[in-house]
Amino acid sequence: MAPSFIFVEDRPAPLDATSDPPSLFDGTTRLYTSYVCPFAQRVWITRNFKGLQEKIKLVPLDLGNRPAWYKEKVYPENKVPALEHNGKIIGESLDLIKYLDNTFEGPSLYPEDHAKREFGDELLKYTDTFVKTMYVSLKGDPSKETAPVLDYLENALYKFDDGPFFLGQLSLVDIAYIPFIERFQTVLNELFKCDITAERPKLSAWIEEINKSDGYAQTKMDPKEIVEVFKKKFM
């Protein structure tokens, strides 16, 4: 379960091409992120739910004007998220949320139960299909094209009855999906008049429940900004 305390954190200003780098590889654990990137948001949420706000420093980047030193000295892939820890850099959001859960102290975000772990692994693998389908739908008929993957999530939420989340209690699976649900719920409703929760009561309840979590709520984007970002990048 997520920590019960509320840690209020000010968001640092994003670093851009004019910004000096931090003191790299000085023993500080840093999460290089972007406030608009759903993949990076996964790791940010995990950090918060583990209660690691004071142990992992946020280093947000301006992806539209990113500093050259990031690619040259930190992460040659030049993407976010990336974690600077113990003198090395680790990337890829799904790998990172597992790494944070397995490496750092704090509440476990993946169950011990074999059946739940097996289903959780299946759902984590499905994120690629889900994300690709949702983005591709923006060029066609989202109401029709997103239905199969949204129905998949709706049905998955019936699997366990010991809580409102995919594996009953909140886990890495919920964290992997919520940044994308957050964005597409807003974009499809605002631009296509498509309600992704219509006739999907479990998905609706899941969204309502996870929005109560402070560790997630502090990472959310402004809905107006979501729409503007999608208009600019994908439409």
From Swiss-Prot:
PROSITE patterns membership: GST_CTER, GST_NTER
Main location: cytoplasm
Catalysed reactions, as listed in the record: RX + glutathione = an S-substituted glutathione + a halide anion + H(+)
Domain of life: Eukaryota
Localization of this protein: Cytoplasm, Cytosol
InterPro entries in the record: Glutathione-S-Trfase_C_sf, Glutathione_S-Trfase, Glutathione_S-Trfase_N, GSTL1/2/3, Thioredoxin-like_sf
Residues engaged in binding glutathione: 37-38, 65-66, 79-80, 92-93
Listed CDD domains: GST_C_Lambda
GO BP term (any one): protein glutathionylation
Gene Ontology CC terms: cytosol; plasma membrane
Keyword RNA-binding: no
Enzyme type, top EC level: transferase
Domain GST N-terminal: 27-108
GST C-terminal domain: residues covered: 86-230
Enzyme Commission number(s) of this protein: 2.5.1.18
Entry keyword set: Cytoplasm, Detoxification, Transferase
GO terms assigned for molecular function: glutathione transferase activity
Functional note: Catalyzes the glutathione-dependent reduction of S-glutathionylquercetin to quercetin.
PANTHER family: GLUTATHIONE S-TRANSFERASE L1, GLUTATHIONE S-TRANSFERASE L1-RELATED
Family the UniProt entry places it in: Belongs to the GST superfamily. Lambda family.
Protein name: Glutathione S-transferase L3
Organism of origin: Arabidopsis thaliana (Mouse-ear cress)
